[in-house]
């Protein structure tokens, strides 16, 4: 019984204790998961700050660019201009060129015309005629330019102007494989329509397409354009039916479809680029609803259709749009493509465009050697597709990897570099807070991104801005003077050819240290006496010689003038003494004797002319009361002042008619040992 009982206890302990091993594992896994989450948070924080900084710099450079990227050596392909005309340029030709421009005001500009080539109007509910003329297999298209003007104070709504640009017969449900490209109808809209004399009154421009189709409606709802031979067109139609635009004859009905596209929005931005367009048309009902209650809807069999099904079921208008200078040129401008995504495939688009181009155009593109044609067709040249993805590293471990993309845009500043070498060079020079390593890939490239621990993130701006008021420091609009720094960086080294090998990771494993090449321009100096920051324009003057700037002299004089408990003579002596001490830099008690004797030598004649000798003596006595000067210094100063007075004999004769002193007493230079003046009667 004992063994059985023991085994039962063991089994019971297994049954009841089966949780203990799993709880131990969970207790081990839980800290590991928390550690991974903490590491991931540190990874996000490490990449968050530089990304926010570069996003801010991107926005600021869009508003006030510091440099033009097309001027950089590795971005030369962004510069579409050439310097060929500089060799033959002459200053004397400027006047003739300006006069020629004024003499030909109607010369077409680069985008003088908006050309619309209509491929066809597609509608499944309309049956084409089988035994009729070609013009009965078409619909009438009217294009209007809608100008939405700014609302005035008295207007309830924005005034709208509709300018008709033309009417065309557009093929109805054409077969594009059997139709010649040159047979498509075309319409031109001059750019003068978009830039009138009062363009400031127009807020936005739109194109309004209005398609009208006449035919018979069968019981199934389809419209047929078959003509009835028994209809007598000479029969008179009642006036009431004439006013009804939807009825043209017995059983005939007219349907009108409209669509509107914005050319320039309210911010004057172009919305319609060169390309192929397919517009969903909306049918206008026979009984129009009030404009205030009108809504755009697409209804079929009582059910609302998704937007993409509208292009397969509802009526659509296909056309090709391009901006051209020569309306007689049948060639098609390069089609502007949107930003390519990771799944973009341009082969189908290119083949579709080539089917719509005339045959002579391809020959023209291949043999044309003009600069303008090369510029126009360069964006459409087939180039190798590169799939680029970024791999973010933190603590030498891969933390995150982006999806592969086909474009060469910088992820931080969205700059289109157009070439892989230019992208890597831009990332290395413009985003040096990160370290980028290029890793070749069979289908493209992989760029490893890690934090640059050696980056000097100290403040490199104007050091005076730190000590200035916040509102004033960053309110300047133009360049300011910086501290002069002279460094010889490099002396025109031989430029190496662009190669992707310079972006590969170094074999020694040490990351490249991004160091600052220029230093010293953000160094800040201070005045030795006032401890105020020294401005760059004050660097040429020694701060030790700036004890008495003009503003400080004026301030001292103004403060003394505000005293009310002293007379004018005492104010004058105080002004002279304070300016004298400031100019010579006397700051210690033991310098007062020297300051007094120097003051007599410099300002003695002025004191004698203004009869301020008594006031000066009172000033020396005041200094003696504070133990700044001795009686011997007072004796020497007054004796020297007496010698200066005796050296001006003409001064005595000129002063007899004047008041003797500021206090109304004549002054003799005799004094006692206690510094008190003795008045001698004449």
Curated annotation (Swiss-Prot):
In its keyword annotation, does this UniProt entry include Metal-binding? yes
Zinc finger regions (C2H2-type), where?
408-431
**Would you say which domain of life the source belongs to?**
Eukaryota
The record's region (VEFS-box) falls at 523-599
- One Gene Ontology MF term: zinc ion binding
- Its biological function? Polycomb group (PcG) protein. Component of the prc2/eed-ezh2 complex, which methylates 'Lys-9' and 'Lys-27' of histone H3, leading to transcriptional repression of the affected target gene.
Listed under subunit, the entry gives: Component of the prc2/eed-ezh2 complex.
Name this protein carries in UniProt: Polycomb protein suz12-B
Question: From which organism does this entry originate?
Answer: Danio rerio (Zebrafish)
């Amino acid at each position: 019984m004992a063994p059985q009982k023991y085994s039962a206890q063991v089994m019971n302990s297994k049954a009841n204790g089966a949780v203990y091993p799993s709880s131990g594992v969970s207790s081990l896994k839980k800290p590991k998961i928390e550690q991974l989450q903490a590491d991931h948070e540190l990874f996000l924080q490490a990449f968050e700050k530089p990304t926010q900084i570069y996003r801010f710099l991107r926005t600021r450079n869009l508003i006030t660019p510091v440099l033009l990227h097309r001027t950089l050596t590795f971005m030369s392909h962004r510069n579409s201009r050439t310097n060929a005309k500089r060799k033959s340029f002459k200053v004397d030709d400027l006047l003739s060129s300006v006069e020629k421009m004024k003499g030909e005001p109607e010369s077409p500009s680069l985008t003088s015309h908006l050309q619309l080539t209509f491929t066809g109007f597609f509608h499944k509910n309309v049956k084409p005629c089988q035994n009729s003329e070609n013009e009965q297999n078409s619909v009438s298209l009217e294009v209007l330019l809608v100008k939405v003007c700014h609302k005035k104070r008295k207007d309830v709504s924005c005034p709208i102007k509709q300018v008709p640009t033309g009417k065309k017969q557009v093929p109805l449900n054409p077969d594009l494989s059997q139709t010649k490209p040159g047979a498509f109808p075309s319409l031109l809209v001059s750019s003068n329509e978009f830039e009138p004399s009062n363009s400031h009154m127009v807020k936005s421009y739109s194109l309004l397409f209005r398609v009208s189709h006449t035919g018979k409606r069968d019981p199934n709802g389809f419209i047929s354009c078959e003509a009835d031979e028994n209809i007598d067109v000479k029969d008179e139609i009642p006036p009431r039916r004439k006013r009804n635009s939807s009825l043209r004859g017995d059983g005939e009905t007219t349907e009108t479809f409209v669509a509107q596209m914005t050319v320039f929005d309210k911010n004057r931005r172009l919305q319609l680029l060169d390309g192929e367009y397919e517009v969903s048309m909306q049918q206008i009902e026979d009984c129009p609803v009030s404009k205030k209650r009108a809504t755009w809807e697409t209804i079929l069999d009582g059910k609302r259709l998704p937007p993409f099904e509208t292009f397969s079921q509802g009526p659509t208008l296909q056309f090709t749009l391009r901006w051209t200078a020569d309306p007689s040129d049948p060639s098609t401008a390069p089609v502007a493509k949107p930003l390519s995504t990771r799944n973009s495939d341009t082969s189908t688009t290119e083949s579709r465009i080539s089917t719509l181009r005339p045959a002579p155009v391809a020959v023209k593109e291949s043999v044309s050697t003009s600069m303008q044609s090369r510029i126009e067709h360069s964006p459409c040249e087939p180039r190798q597709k590169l799939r680029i993805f970024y791999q973010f590293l933190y603590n030498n471990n891969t933390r995150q990897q982006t999806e592969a993309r086909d474009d060469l845009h910088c992820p931080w500043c969205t700059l289109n570099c157009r070439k892989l070498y230019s992208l890597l060079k831009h990332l290395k020079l413009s985003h040096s807070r990160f370290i980028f390593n290029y890793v070749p890939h069979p289908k493209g490239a992989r760029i490893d991104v890690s934090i640059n621990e050696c980056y000097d993130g100290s403040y490199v701006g104007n050091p005076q801005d730190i000590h200035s008021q916040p509102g004033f420091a960053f309110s300047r609009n133009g360049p300011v003077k910086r501290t002069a720094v002279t460094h010889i960086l490099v002396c025109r080294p031989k430029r190496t050819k662009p190669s992707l090998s310079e972006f590969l990771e170094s074999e020694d494993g040490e990351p490249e240290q991004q160091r600052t090449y220029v230093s010293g321009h953000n160094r800040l100096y201070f005045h030795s006496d006032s401890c105020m920051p020294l401005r760059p324009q004050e660097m040429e003057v020694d701060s030790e010689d700036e004890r008495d700037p003009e503003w400080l002299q004026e301030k001292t004089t103004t403060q003394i003038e505000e005293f009310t408990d002293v007379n004018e003579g005492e104010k004058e002596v105080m002004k002279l003494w304070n300016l004298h001490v400031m100019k010579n830099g006397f700051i210690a008690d033991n310098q007062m004797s020297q300051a007094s004797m120097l003051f007599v030598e410099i300002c003695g004649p002025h004191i004698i002319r203004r009869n301020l000798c008594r006031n000066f003596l009172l000033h020396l006595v005041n200094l003696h009361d504070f133990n700044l000067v001795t009686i011997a210094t007072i004796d020497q100063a007054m004796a020297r002042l007496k010698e200066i007075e005796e050296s001006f004999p003409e001064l005595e004769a000129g002063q007899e008619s004047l008041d003797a002193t500021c206090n109304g007493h004549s002054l003799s230079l005799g004094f006692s040992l206690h510094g008190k003046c003795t008045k001698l009667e004449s």
